[in-house]
Design a protein with these regions (language model features):
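Amphipathic alpha-helical interaction modules
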Residues: 16-63
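Amphipathic alpha-helical binding modules
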Residues: 63-124
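N-terminal soluble segments of membrane proteins
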Residues: 1, 125-127
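N-terminal functional modules and adjacent low-complexity/disordered segments of proteins
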Residues: 6, 23, 36, 112-115, ...
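Extended, charge-biased low-complexity segments
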Residues: 10-14
C-alpha cells in the first residue's frame, strides 16, 4: 500500500498519544499498513496469548511499554486486526485495498483525497 508522509505522520501521532515505544510502534505500523508479520512476540500480543508473548519477549521489553501498546490497541486498533491468531492471519492475508479502507475508517491514516490536499497545500511535515 502506498501512503503519503501525511498518513504516516497521522498514524504515529495517534500512537504517540499513548507514548508507545518506537520498538513497539514500528512493527504495528508495518503490520497494519503493509500486512507484514510483526514477529513472534507481537503476533502473540495481537492474538492475546500471554504465555507465548512472555516466552518470546525480548529482555528489554518492559511492562510500561506493553501497557502503552495495549492501551493504544484498545483505543485505536481495528478489532479485526487482533484478538486471536485467526484474526492476525486474516489481517496478514487481507488485500491492501481492504486494509486501507479499514485504517481510514479507524482514522489511522488519511484518505487519498486528504493526502493529495495536504500535498498541494504544502502542509508542514515533521515526525
Amino acid at each position: 500500500m502506498n501512503i503519503s508522509k501525511y498518513s504516516k505522520k497521522k498514524f504515529y501521532e495517534g500512537i504517540g498519544l499513548w507514548r508507545v515505544d518506537d520498538a513497539f510502534a514500528d512493527p504495528m505500523f508495518n503490520y497494519l499498513v503493509y500486512g507484514f508479520s510483526p514477529g513472534s512476540f507481537f503476533t502473540s500480543v495481537l492474538a492475546n496469548d500471554f504465555l507465548s508473548a512472555v516466552a518470546h519477549s525480548h529482555p528489554s521489553n518492559t511492562i510500561t511499554a506493553l501497557k502503552a501498546l495495549t492501551g493504544w490497541m484498545q483505543d485505536y486498533m481495528p478489532r479485526r486486526a487482533f484478538g486471536s491468531y485467526e484474526a492476525v492471519k486474516e489481517w496478514l492475508d487481507m488485500d491492501e485495498t481492504t486494509r486501507r479502507e479499514i485504517l481510514i475508517m479507524h482514522n489511522l491514516i488519511c484518505t487519498p483525497k486528504q493526502e493529495t490536499f495536504l500535498e498541494i497545500k504544502g502542509e508542514e511535515y515533521e515526525m
